[in-house]
Amino acid sequence: METGTFKVKSGLAQMLKGGVIMDVTTPEQAKIAEEAGACAVMALERVPSDIRAAGGVARMADPTIIEQIMKVVSIPVMAKCRIGHFVEAQILESMGVDYIDESEVLTPADENFHVWKHDFKVPFVCGCRDLGEALRRIGEGAAMIRTKGEAGTGNIVEAVRHMRSVMGSVRRVQSMSPDELSAYAKEINAPLELVLELHKTGKLPVVNFAAGGVATPADAALMMQLGADGVFVGSGIFKSSNPSAMAKAVVKAVTHYKDAQILAEISKGLGDAMPGLDIKQIDPDKLISQRGW
């Protein structure tokens, strides 16, 4: 099978199903994540809460940091590029990262176009708030989708909103008659062939993870029960008071997301979760989830 095809790339992402992907900024953190059972790590210079606090322009991480993290773990390593910054993506692909996240957490480089991901052999993950956004990214070649949530807040409300929106729209498409599909594709500005495929199969053609605001094992289990295939945890692990224990607990929560007794047990004695932000108190211009289109 030819490498770099959409089938191969989306197939690779399927292997992460049921897993937790953790943001890490040092080799030491990467080891903690791997030992806790993370299925992959996201190599960053700063976690989203620090990016949010610092303001200014957030760019791709220094390649040195990414290389150092790649050397110490055997699980897949992801890295972020800015929306539309295909040269950052080219650099990351040349370094041999396993996945690229075209991420709204970084400052967008292009306000009109996302990266054309079909040009790359490496699989991409992209964020979405609704089904239209998800299908537009898949149409551009994204091999994996995640909710945008509101990164760096420790507040799960936006991730819940985005997951409910996507899953509700998937159910709506399934119930439509074939003659409604073309008009609906136009309404949500999505490729018609993907809407037709969704109607036929009843599911997205790629894995759909939860991200943005996951701060506790209960948050992770909530997103799984809402239909997520797995969970990204950004600031929630290493901004908590006991990162190693929190990391292990979140991994267990994703595995046992339907068992309330296990969830209660693993939630004990974890110390303080990361400090949280009320979304309503954030200036609308500073909402990360609004980036992208």
UniProtKB/Swiss-Prot annotation:
Record organism: Dehalococcoides mccartyi (strain ATCC BAA-2100 / JCM 16839 / KCTC 5957 / BAV1)
Pathway: Cofactor biosynthesis; pyridoxal 5'-phosphate biosynthesis
Active site: residue positions: K80 (schiff-base intermediate with d-ribose 5-phosphate)
Catalytic activity: aldehydo-D-ribose 5-phosphate + D-glyceraldehyde 3-phosphate + L-glutamine = pyridoxal 5'-phosphate + L-glutamate + phosphate + 3 H2O + H(+)
InterPro entries: Aldolase_TIM, PdxS/SNZ, PdxS/SNZ_N, RibuloseP-bd_barrel
One Pfam family per UniProt: SOR_SNZ
UniProt function note: Catalyzes the formation of pyridoxal 5'-phosphate from ribose 5-phosphate (RBP), glyceraldehyde 3-phosphate (G3P) and ammonia. The ammonia is provided by the PdxT subunit. Can also use ribulose 5-phosphate and dihydroxyacetone phosphate as substrates, resulting from enzyme-catalyzed isomerization of RBP and G3P, respectively.
GO biological process: one example: amino acid metabolic process
Assembly description: In the presence of PdxT, forms a dodecamer of heterodimers.
Protein name: Pyridoxal 5'-phosphate synthase subunit PdxS
Residues given in the record as D-glyceraldehyde 3-phosphate binding sites: R164
GO molecular function: pyridoxal 5'-phosphate synthase (glutamine hydrolysing) activity
Gene assigned in the entry: pdxS
Family annotation (SUPFAM superfamilies): Ribulose-phoshate binding barrel
EC number, UniProt record: 4.3.3.6
Binding site for D-ribose 5-phosphate: D23, G152, G213, G234, S235
Keywords assigned: Lyase, Pyridoxal phosphate, Schiff base
HAMAP family in the record: PdxS
UniProt similarity note: Belongs to the PdxS/SNZ family.
PANTHER family per the UniProt record, alphabetical: PYRIDOXAL 5'-PHOSPHATE SYNTHASE SUBUNIT SNZ1-RELATED
